[in-house]
Design a protein with these regions (language model features):
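Arg/Lys-rich, positively charged N-terminal/basic patches that mediate binding to nucleic acids
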Residues: 1-26
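Membrane-topology and secretion signals of cell-surface/extracellular proteins
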Residues: 1-3, 15, 34, 48-51, ...
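Compact soluble domain cores
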Residues: 13, 23-43
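Enriched for short, Lys/Arg-rich terminal
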Residues: 73-112
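Short, surface-exposed coil-to-beta transition loops
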Residues: 64-69
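Anionic group-transfer/hydrolysis microenvironments
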Residues: 12, 55-57, 86
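A short, surface-exposed loop/turn module that caps and links secondary-structure elements
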Residues: 34-63
Length: 112
């Protein structure tokens, strides 16, 4: 499948945390290109309505100890929403409450 026509949209939360982490526009382009190869290849997070998590290198840590980007690919809109980012040593996983909120957000994105 050709994913090259996908548009990326960043939530304000994602943009703020990306900048706070000191990541660059070049880092963002690398991330987008990795996701574009196959947006469905990253593991889906159970209970979120299709949100996926991709590992990214951060600082001196590789992908495993680095950061996590949370995103969702809305096929019908040909749009990938970059929802959140967190650094592994600051947070391990999304809480149940965060998953519920993100699931509602995905439903709104699909409808709108």
């Amino acid at each position: 499948m050709d994913y090259s026509k996908r548009t990326f949209i960043q939530t304000p939360t994602f943009s703020k945390k990306w900048d706070e982490a000191g990541l660059t526009d070049d880092d963002l382009r690398v991330l987008e290109n990795i996701i574009l190869r196959d947006p469905k290849s990253s593991p889906a997070i159970r209970g979120t309505g299709g949100i996926r998590k991709i590992r990214i290198p951060y600082g001196n840590n590789g992908k495993r100890g680095g950061g996590r980007v949370i995103y969702v690919d809305i096929d019908i809109k040909e749009t990938i929403y970059l929802l959140d980012i967190y650094i592994k040593n600051e947070k391990v996983d999304l809480s149940v409450e965060e998953k519920k909120v993100l699931k509602k957000l995905v439903e709104l994105l699909r409808e709108g």
